Amino acid sequence: MPVSSLFSFGVNLIHRGGRARPLQSIYRMELRFGLFLSVALIPVIFAQDISHGSIVVDGTMTVAQTDDNFVCATIDWWPHDKCDYGQCPWHYTSVTNLNLSHPFLAKAVQAFNNLRIRVGGSLQDQVQYDVGNLKSPCHPFEKMKDGLFGFSKGCLHMERWDELNRFFKETGVMVTFGLNALHGRHKVKRSLWGGDWDSSNAQEFLKYTISKGYHIDSWEFGNELSGHAPGGFFEEEWFVKLLQTSGSRVLDVMSHHMYNLGAGVDPKLISKILNPDHLNKASYTFGNLTHVIRRHGPWSSAWVGESGGAYNSGGAHVSNTFVNSFWQTLIGGNYGLLNATTFVPNPDYYSALLWHRLMGKVVLSVESDASPFLRSYAHCSKGRAGVTLLVINLSNQTNFVMNVQNSINLKLAVNEQNMNQGGFTHTLKKTFSWVGTKASNEALFREEYHLTPKDGYLQSRTMVLNGIPLEFTDAGNIPSLDPVHVNLKSPISISPLSIAFIVFPNFKAPACG
């Protein structure tokens, strides 16, 4: 299909270099980890209740798969004078002026080992590339009353592009770059643009990138051009139409954005975050999106391109504290993984890093008899045998004490009970002790990573791991993220308003290979 007709929808897509191929569906996992966005916005209330229960993990089959680089972060285009609700939180963190030589920045990125970085955001459709026969001067973004998002066109010098790619190579990141989809088009009215896309500037930019040997994993076309459409917020009709019109093997990925908390200034932010029913609303989006992809574009996959929780730079004193275990921007705004001025990691950096290191691609089924305020998710462990469980306690007053069970052993216990009536209780207790491991005389342990805010203050800027505050070392390195080893036979205790990663190295899960 000709470029002009394919892109006439003015929507967002991602194309990866080489032969088109489907990717693992990140959206499938976003349903699970998207609920890991925040724990609370109010002071800690010490446990008043203790609730006992069970978590059952089914390791016999895969229910979904994520991409290898599920965790990703954005380097945005917003200039320092981008302001929302009387605050200007972006500072000098733009693609064009971020201090790439800051030692904290490189070390924070390298700790992920192949972090996906998206270069893009709202202003990407105003960016010109200073290469080839550019017909206008290459000026930085400036405030402009009638401009898109209140700014003029901006420009990326190739010297800066060279610097960025040196940084990408040195830190081992995987790059997704968002192209300007409005070049050559004209504004018809407030949110409507007409005319054909002029691909000449993008083509010159691509040629330059290839000539320099820079490896860009994927190219994204446009950003929220139509609001509720691909590259923006999910709307079934738009997604179906694009897949039907483009046809087989044209689009590798359909991306959409998630800001299910609403505006960062919303006074109801707290109640939304602590309400499991509100968090569950995301499941409808993912369910519908799954249906659309399977029926109309099974060659494609879906990515959540942005998921900052609250839009318009996030919530001040919320998105940059312990309560925000979501991520979107690498640095800048209130929802960055790193502080915009000191480059020191915000609390959610560490929860994202632990996810990246511990949770593998294969998603397993989990069932729990606990209240909806305890959220449980299981994956095959990353790079090792066993299963890793993520547990989030959204309750501000209940301590959950949970036995973790393997569905395989439960089935064995039921079969044994059928053969020997009257011994079921004893058999079940015996089953609970092994959590899916093969019988052994040696002491067995699990690894636990409990995340809490410093001094119990949920809007703290310091994350605490197993009672130890996480802070840069004197040499400016990321601190060690060490687990505590707990006897496998003991139940798991999840304190109010906390997050825990639990690794079971010997969990028997055929789906994990």
Segments (PLM) and residue ranges:
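N-terminal secretory signal peptides that target proteins for export/translocation
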Residues: 1-26
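Non-catalytic accessory regions flanking glycosidase/transglycosidase catalytic cores in CAZymes
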Residues: 2-3, 23-253, 282-305, 310-513
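Substrate-binding/catalytic cleft of secreted carbohydrate-active enzymes
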Residues: 230-233, 257-285
